[in-house]
Amino acid sequence: MKKKIYAVCALVLVVAMFFSFAACDAGTTDTEETTVAAMSEMPVGKEAMVNYYNSVINAVKVKKPAVKKFQSTENVSNVICGTEDGERNTLLEKSVPTLKKFIFDGTKKAFEESRNAETKYGDDLTALFPVSGESWSSRLTAADVESAEIEANDDNSQRTLTLVIKEPSVDLVKKAFNLGSEEDRAAAVKEFREKLKGYLSFTDIESLTYTECKIICVINTKDNTVASVEYIRTEKITTTITGEGTLAEIGTLPCSFEYTYGDKYEMDWTDPSTTTTAEAD
């Protein structure tokens, strides 16, 4: 029975992953701290913060720093599985946390190529950096944002700006996030259907809603360049799994869960040609 429960839990977590498509040290003396002079004043108020974010983030694709992209966070929570008559399968739900590490570690390699990437200074960022395929990275307005907060570090060398999107719909999220490719999603679903054939089947997404979308942007104050930006999304996904063959006794289980994941981009604004010239001198 444990194997059957593990198989169902594994499927829940795998479906979540495949259906989803985020510094300077203060110089000190014995008597005083050294602070960095900022290029611009700290923005005050939500509208000013959103405009500030748009200004610095849209400059990334124009100025083309070296970029390193990687997955920053991943989690499955609020799993609810039960029978069609509404009876909860609490044993299945409680087994999910113990299987997360196993499932995530086992699928890590499959995601490395699509989720991890690195570019050199001057490379075109149109495809890699949000919003993929566009010349811009954000078209958010103050009306799109639930909350905005900004804070400088101790020596004022960097500011961390956090934006939480208001009631995130697909159309709204597309104004600042990468949503992924329908072709990639279809290919992933097809692969897992074939692997699980005869044991388990699952429906396509019956519903997918964004419950929270957040952007955390770290900005270098001396020149208003982006040091890093993280895009974090939480999606509530509903699907149905059905046991087949030796797992037929599981029956049909409607399942819903929240899947949180983040992509983070780190920037290096060093121009190699400038560095080479300086060394030659």
Label each residue range with its predicted role:
Residues 26-281:
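Subset-of-secretome marker
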